[in-house]
């Protein structure tokens, strides 16, 4: 791999020299920052087991090296990436894996280190969705996740990734993360705050990441981070777990933010050390029990992770003064819900008791039950999965519902050529058409969408915004 030419401000280098632990080499740090970042993926276990995924891609010649802290994570080397980008492979398009930097898998690994079974989790800064989808997989689509994103332009990307991965237990919000402590006090069993930061750890991916860097900027960012962690801590129930993480390397945005929380609530914060998180974690362990990952340690991005427990209740913040407005959905009565469920089952859609049916005008939605106590307390951008639209002849089943709730045994398998046509938004002409009028189409046993049979043709319903042009997947060799 060709080396990057990374811009390093002198003040940054001086700061890193001072922060570097004695057992690490500063020269190795500079050398690691100049090397291009290794690519990595995470298998989406909501759709496929790790073992089945490895068997599926074995013929492709991909070199997959396990990520020590995430059993679903792998560094990947493959030939032909220029000809066929990883994001255009069949397995990515159908949500079997997520392209995710290895370091960014650490916070969720820390959140679930003791195999907890949280009912309600918040991801405070969620876009583009790598950690939200990782949390959902660890929860098995059970319970509920509030995924918040402050940037309006990134909410759409967040939803697209959640939908592609077949996730049904997420509610999206679009707020400054500092509102939740007052709006949703003690509402969550676990919270991930992957805080906005100066990004010092991402220079291997972006050689110009430090162009606007300054010590003063770091201090300004740290002030915001303190407000975010304070809000998150108020939103956490006593006994719950908070993971604070950044992709930066300075102490002001990392250790100092956590120490500020400790000094503010000394009777209520307990550090949960991460030295046993995975084999080799001790190489990045700080004296406090945090992980401070310099790029040369594991040949990945720089990262910081702290895991905390809330041991006692704290004084609540003043109640917010805004009005949320009337909740625009109503739950379906049991008789109506039974009719919708039966119609969905007939086309091959099924869900568990952790989801309930709600209606807004002609739209039918499936909401995660675990989120219902929060309805009316904050305004949601989106909740759960849009199941269908009601029309004169029945129901128009929505693409995201097919991806989340399709039962593979009620499906019509496409050939590779037919699947490529499907992803290009074209109708499919199989040799033998399915018997039913509507059929869930699959490739590699994974749902791609719902097709309507018109004679010998399968009419494509793939959403226009997802249609792909150019070369798609290569198939088995």
Swiss-Prot record:
Chain residues that bind S-adenosyl-L-methionine: 125-131, 149, 176, 194
HAMAP family, per the entry: 16SrRNA_methyltr_F
Known role: Specifically methylates the cytosine at position 1407 (m5C1407) of 16S rRNA.
Catalytic activity as recorded in UniProt: cytidine(1407) in 16S rRNA + S-adenosyl-L-methionine = 5-methylcytidine(1407) in 16S rRNA + S-adenosyl-L-homocysteine + H(+)
GO terms under biological process: rRNA base methylation
UniProt name for this protein: Ribosomal RNA small subunit methyltransferase F
Family per record: Belongs to the class I-like SAM-binding methyltransferase superfamily. RsmB/NOP family.
Keyword terms of this UniProt record: Cytoplasm, Methyltransferase, RNA-binding, rRNA processing, S-adenosyl-L-methionine, Transferase
